[in-house]
From Swiss-Prot:
Record has Translocase as a keyword: no
Domain of life: Eukaryota
Protein name: Accessory gland protein Acp29AB
Keywords carried by this UniProt record: Behavior, Disulfide bond, Glycoprotein, Lectin, Secreted, Signal
Coiled coil, from the record: none
One Gene Ontology cellular component annotation held by this UniProt entry: extracellular region
PROSITE patterns hit by this protein: C_TYPE_LECTIN_2
């Protein structure tokens, strides 16, 4: 009797354990939780693409603006360089004409246009004012040359025959010799100079004139009177 009751209780105990344990086991047909959607959805990708397209377009416009500004600056620099080269080439053209014989020298100098100073003859232009380049050509057309003054005595003799004015002479630094003033006739430094002290030295002051028994430098395109020498050598 007791054995039967004990077996019955054990059976009930096992049945309770089985029924209680199954309550904790999830149903195999239960719905699983939905996975979290990724952040980069199709809409977000499209928005990012639009952002980058806009960014790239702005950067491209900025780059094009920079290129346009650079091209404009380069064009201005080229024009300035061309103008500067034209100025620098003008004296070289004159020298080339001189050496090529386009301005032909002749011994038949019209001496009536020249005055004797010491042992040499000079034409002192008292009325016409020209640039240094024009004065150079005018003296060559007389079959002479812009004056190379040999000494102070010759300088004083020339100015004694001339009104109180400024006169171009053959001293310049148009062709680079280390920034040194030279004669275009000899290609060497002048044998005589008498500079006015404390002159304002400027890069474009490349041509020399005489005034009041002293020598000055000025821009070659300034118009002044000039002195030619009859002989075509130094």
């Amino acid at each position: 009797m007791y054995a039967t009751n004990l077996l019955y209780l054990l059976a009930l105990w096992n049945l309770w354990l089985v029924s209680g344990g199954q309550q904790d086991i999830p149903n195999g047909n239960a719905t699983l939780p939905s996975p979290q959607k990724p952040q980069n959805t199709i809409d977000q990708i499209g928005a990012n693409q639009n952002y980058w397209f806009t960014y790239n377009a702005l950067r491209q416009n900025e780059t094009l603006a920079i290129i346009d500004a650079m091209e404009s600056g380069i064009a201005s620099s080229v024009l300035a360089f061309q103008a500067q080269m034209e100025i620098q080439l003008q004296p070289l053209k004159i020298i080339m004409l001189h050496h090529a014989g386009n301005i032909k020298a002749s011994n038949n100098i019209k001496m009536s246009r020249f005055e004797k100073v010491g042992s040499r003859y000079f034409h002192i232009e008292k009325n016409l004012t020209l640039t240094w380049f024009e004065a150079y050509v005018t003296c060559r057309e007389m079959n002479g040359h812009l004056a190379n003054i040999r000494d102070e005595k010759e300088l004083d003799g020339i100015l004694a025959l001339a009104p109180n004015n400024s006169y171009w002479v053959d001293i310049s630094k148009l062709v680079e010799y280390g920034g040194t003033f030279v004669s275009t006739l000899t290609g060497r430094e002048p044998i005589f100079v008498k500079w006015k002290p404390n002159q304002d030295k400027k890069k474009q002051h490349n041509c020399v004139y005489i005034y009041a028994k002293e020598m000055y430098y000025d821009e070659c395109f300034e118009k002044k009177s000039f002195v030619c020498q009859a002989n075509q050598w130094a």
